[in-house]
């Protein structure tokens, strides 16, 4: 009988350890989140666009400081040539706005990105808000310069 009691205690300890392990694993699993940047200002959309800089509609993108609009994203994209090699791309949807006729951002002559819904302005170099009280940045996408004349625009 003593051997059966010892066996019961060992089995009981194993069951308790399994419960503890399961509980810890569950807490760790549920407590983990992705390491991506949370963006409450825009709904998520997969972006995978190609832009051929040799096409006539993108001739302004061939020089540093040039910019152009193209399709893609939530309401189109703004592409900006930083220095002849590096490019920036931003969604034309105004941060924090639902798609509408006033929520498609434009670029002004001072190279600011403008939202006419709330008169907010954004820096074309990094998407930072220039308007006091605005906390959301313009939604930026990753631009890969594949061969000097072909750009690939995707989510980060």
Question: Which role fits each region the language model picked out?
Answer:
Residues 13-20:
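Positively charged n-region of N-terminal signal peptides that target proteins for export
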